[in-house]
């Protein structure tokens, strides 16, 4: 199960598609991709 926007994360793999882990803040943020 992936983490949605602003969900807690340890790595980008924790986040849903088009989201990447912001390591400093430890949450998933949009990675600026669409496809």
Swiss-Prot record:
It comes from the Eukaryota. The record marks 3, 22 as: May be involved in interaction with voltage sensor. Disulfide bonds join 2-16, 9-21, 15-28. Pfam families: Toxin_12. GO terms for cellular component: extracellular region. Its main location: secreted. GO terms for molecular function: ion channel inhibitor activity; potassium channel regulator activity; toxin activity. Transmembrane segments: none annotated. It is found in: Secreted. Keywords: Disulfide bond, Ion channel impairing toxin, Knottin, Neurotoxin, Potassium channel impairing toxin, Secreted, Toxin, Voltage-gated potassium channel impairing toxin. The record marks 30 as: Involved in active face. Residues 4-6 are annotated as: Involved in active face. Expressed by the venom gland. Inhibitor of voltage-gated potassium channels. Inhibits Kv2.1/KCNB1 channels, by shifting activation of the channel to more depolarized voltages. The toxin binding sites may be situated on the S3-S4 extracellular linker of the channel. One, two, three or four toxin molecules may bind the Kv2.1/KCNB1 channel. May need to partition into the membrane in order to bind to the channel. Antibacterial activity is not observed. Belongs to the neurotoxin 10 (Hwtx-1) family. 09 (HaTx) subfamily. The presence of a 'disulfide through disulfide knot' structurally defines this protein as a knottin. This is Kappa-theraphotoxin-Gr1b.
């Amino acid at each position: 199960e992936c983490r949605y926007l602003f969900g807690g994360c340890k790595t980008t793999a924790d986040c849903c598609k088009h989201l990447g882990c912001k390591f400093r803040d430890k949450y998933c943020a949009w990675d600026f991709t669409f496809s």
